[in-house]
Amino acid sequence: AFRIAQSGRKGPVLVDIPKDITAAVCEFTPKKPEPIRTVVTFDEQQVKWAADIINGAQRPLVYFGGGVRSAASCQPLRDLLKKAEIPATYTLMAAGVVPYGDPMNIGMVGMHGCYTSNRAVADCDVLIAVGTRFSDRVALNPKTFAKNATIIQIDIDASELGKNVDVDLSIVGDAAYVLNAMLPLVEEKKHPDWMKMIHEWQAQDYHPVSDASRLMPHQVIGEVCNQCGPEAVYVTDVGQHQMWAAQYYKYRSPRHFITSGGMGTMGYGLGACIGAKVGVPDTPVINIAGDGCFRMNMNEIATATRYNIPIIEVVFNNHALGMVRQWQTLFYGKRYSQTCLLYTSPSPRD
């Protein structure tokens, strides 16, 4: 199961053990773990075509996702951005691949992303998508997503290529190997006009303002990061607090921001935080949760206590299922149902 989980497109594996097997008495002979097999083959001609397209671009943009979080993929991606001066935007699952403060990092894209990234997607002429699946949180309208761009998609899973958004060139392969093969073929160049546009948009990005009368989300996230430092591991549950953490956490490296994408499973954070702490016992591990998520799985505190696993739990308590309530406000005429967690009052506190 672990070998399968770490092979090809990495992901969870269900181990389903029937009850009769759990009750049986049998001999156990340990097997030597099989080597992890990763798909590394790719079409070299397609890589050359991709490099030619990138070399001819005036407004190139890299859009990357969780598929490039492995250490082997991060460096060639950063090298590509630097060599060809290509700005990059990313999904929730890829936070930290390109460090905060890197001039080529223009922020998270999509529904919960920043103005600059979404504007860059709309205006780029070449989009290089690496290890990402064009989810509905990014490509809200697949027919108009990056409609002015030639789209190149690189993914280890062939079934993801062109699945949600039509692409012009698709490359099946491990991102690390494909990017390393592409690097010598991509020309070193500058895009002054394109970067000028990027900087103008960045001036219009939303920047939260502190309010002396109440504690604001960015202040909480900022102080947690200041106290725990960039080497800590930050885990989040699912909801508004998750997006605040993604937006305001000043990440420096991959795998220091752990969250649940895709299914968005509430209650994920506490168990993941315990697991992360077991993996890096000498590193501070913090779980950022909402009061709704905390209620989903707070029994795991007993696990942490029983095994003496020291974790830090930060709970945003607004007495509501905040993200669901936000959608009820925006799309359902403020018809609130089952989202208030403060039962003595009809509405949550701010």
Labelled PLM ranges:
Residues 19, 94-197:
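Glycine-rich, acidic loop regions that bind phosphate or pyrophosphate groups
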Residues 346-350:
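A short, hydrophobic C-terminal helix/tail in secreted or cell-surface proteins
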Residues 118, 162-164, 170-172, 176-182, ...:
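Thiamine diphosphate
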Residues 17-22, 66-68, 95, 158, ...:
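Glycine-rich beta-alpha junction loops
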